[in-house]
Amino acid sequence: MTLPATALFPQALMPLHIFEPRYREMLRDVLASNRLFAVAGLDAARASEPEAEEPPHRVATVGIVRACQKNENGTSNLLLQGLCRVEVVSIAHEVPYRKIRVRALSSTAGASAAENEVLRAELARLISVKLRLAAAGGKEMAAFLRTVDDPEIFSDIAAFSVCEDARVKQRLLETLDVHRRLHKLFDLVTQTQHQIFR
């Protein structure tokens, strides 16, 4: 599934409303098999290329349908949980819906466990301040993020939950080095806080 201004991260939960006929058919097939499908962001920079129809970004995420409610009008509401980053290798076919070939991508630590833990803890503190100032639900998300000890999982859930700019989210999704991802997120949160407190 290729969606504009969207980046799903591993471990993150994304609600989706399925209404297009092609995606209704895809969902029927997915629910009848392994409940897995990929979500790729629409690469707007490539959208104007000749013969480019909904070009996906190179890095996407495979997710699993955790819950699905079918509506009387044929639409569905579902909750998709990201499982792993993938590289979009090719588009296999478009009809009746897009199917892509993917290759699983793995993150690398990029630094020692101790260095990543220090950065994760400092980032958790900054995000906690940011989310406490945010709208409803911020305190709960901040409390949840404080319980996530693994720097890789933390960086993914934090990026999905805190970052509002889809282009920045996509760059974070494409960053396989966990230390670098944490640093990018740290810089983003710091910059946002400076703007808030001006």
Please place each PLM-identified region on the residue numbering.
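N-terminal low-complexity, acidic/polar interaction/targeting segments
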Residues: 1-198
